[in-house]
């Protein structure tokens, strides 16, 4: 029944065609045939299998190897909603920072950006005024070059600049601050350190950590000692994750060195292959052999 229904439907174009000119009235007998086909066990079983295959496919795409969802957010959620255009941008920015456990870092960076905009004579007025967009772009490029930003903060300014959302930058920064300020005032933070900290060391570290949070936040610190990190510390919380350990820094430096070395050897090999003495060029010397004069 199901096979016959499918062949008939496709051949006639009555049930699945998007063309109105080929549509013919469906008779009562044909309606009964369709209903019988849909109610047939084979049809229901096919639908069930298709649904399960779809669910399995989605599960594979949205879960990691351990079966844990990679799309389910484990980050923070603001307790207020701002529906204005600038508020929607602020929510998107908050979600991005939350998913990367960097709300604290982004909040601190963008507070600095907002301070620069507010206190630089004429900058806020220029961004919200009628001057040419190219001039506004130059201003924001100079601003970005004057501060160190994490990927989330940097992308926010990049997006707002090149989408010409100049008038929404300051309002979005204000709304983002409101979202951050709406968070729960109690925060549990796990600190991993290389050795058992003294009270003085704990006070210094906790003061540094607190600078990433709203002033009214109540803190609950817990410590874990891991000698393998050698020096420094690791912060873990729903608000911010930050690895400032010596061992991680060494790994990053080694990875960068390996990357540069691999690129160096690749350039040499290509030069030999193409019979070009690339090592004698100014570009090669500037890239690999120039001394860092700042260390002299």
Swiss-Prot record:
List localization entries.
Mitochondrion; Mitochondrion inner membrane
Q: Name one GO biological process term.
A: proton motive force-driven mitochondrial ATP synthesis
* Protein keywords: ATP synthesis, Hydrogen ion transport, Ion transport, Membrane, Mitochondrion, Mitochondrion inner membrane, Transit peptide, Transport
Give the residue range of the signal peptide: none
**Molecular function terms in GO for this entry?**
proton-transporting ATP synthase activity, rotational mechanism
Is Iron one of the keywords UniProt gives this record? no
InterPro entries, per database record: ATP_synth_OSCP/delta_N_sf, ATPase_OSCP/dsu
Write out the GO cellular component annotations. Answer: mitochondrial inner membrane; phagocytic vesicle
**Role summary:** Subunit OSCP, of the mitochondrial membrane ATP synthase complex (F(1)F(0) ATP synthase or Complex V) that produces ATP from ADP in the presence of a proton gradient across the membrane which is generated by electron transport complexes of the respiratory chain. ATP synthase complex consist of a soluble F(1) head domain - the catalytic core - and a membrane F(1) domain - the membrane proton channel. These two domains are linked by a central stalk rotating inside the F(1) region and a stationary peripheral stalk.
Q: Which family does it belong to?
A: Belongs to the ATPase delta chain family.
Q: How does it assemble?
A: Component of the ATP synthase complex composed at least of ATP5F1A/subunit alpha, ATP5F1B/subunit beta, ATP5MC1/subunit c (homooctomer), MT-ATP6/subunit a, MT-ATP8/subunit 8, ATP5ME/subunit e, ATP5MF/subunit f, ATP5MG/subunit g, ATP5MK/subunit k, ATP5MJ/subunit j, ATP5F1C/subunit gamma, ATP5F1D/subunit delta, ATP5F1E/subunit epsilon, ATP5PF/subunit F6, ATP5PB/subunit b, ATP5PD/subunit d, ATP5PO/subunit OSCP.
Q: What is this protein called?
A: ATP synthase peripheral stalk subunit OSCP, mitochondrial
């Amino acid at each position: 029944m199901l096979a016959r229904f499918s062949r008939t439907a496709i051949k006639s174009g009555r049930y699945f065609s998007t063309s109105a000119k080929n549509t013919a009235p469906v008779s009562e007998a044909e309606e009964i045939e369709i209903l019988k086909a849909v109610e047939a066990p084979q049809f229901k079983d096919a639908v069930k299998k298709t649904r399960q295959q779809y669910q399995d496919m989605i599960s594979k795409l949205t879960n990691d190897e351990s079966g844990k969802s990679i799309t389910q957010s484990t980050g923070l959620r603001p307790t207020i909603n701002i529906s204005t255009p600038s508020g929607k941008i602020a929510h998107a920015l908050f979600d991005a920072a939350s998913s990367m456990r960097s709300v604290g870092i982004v909040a601190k960076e963008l507070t600095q950006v907002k301070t620069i905009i507010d206190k630089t004579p004429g900058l806020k007025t220029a961004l919200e005024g009628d001057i040419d967009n190219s001039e506004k772009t130059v201003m924001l490029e100079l601003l970005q070059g004057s501060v160190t930003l994490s990927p989330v903060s940097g992308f926010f300014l990049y997006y707002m600049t090149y989408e010409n959302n100049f008038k929404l930058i300051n309002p979005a920064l204000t709304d983002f601050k409101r979202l951050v300020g709406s968070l729960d005032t109690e925060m549990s933070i796990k600190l991993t350190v290389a050795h058992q900290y003294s009270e003085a060391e704990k006070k210094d570290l906790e003061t540094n950590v607190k600078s990433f949070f709203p002033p009214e936040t109540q803190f609950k610190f817990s410590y874990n000692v891991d000698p393998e990190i050698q020096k420094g510390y690791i912060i873990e919380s729903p608000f911010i994750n930050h690895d400032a350990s010596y061992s991680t820094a060494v790994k990053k430096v080694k990875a960068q060195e390996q990357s540069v070395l691999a690129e160096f050897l690749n350039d040499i090999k290509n030069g030999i292959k193409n019979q070009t003495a690339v090592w004698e060029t100014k570009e090669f010397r500037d890239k690999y052999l120039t001394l860092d004069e700042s260390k002299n």
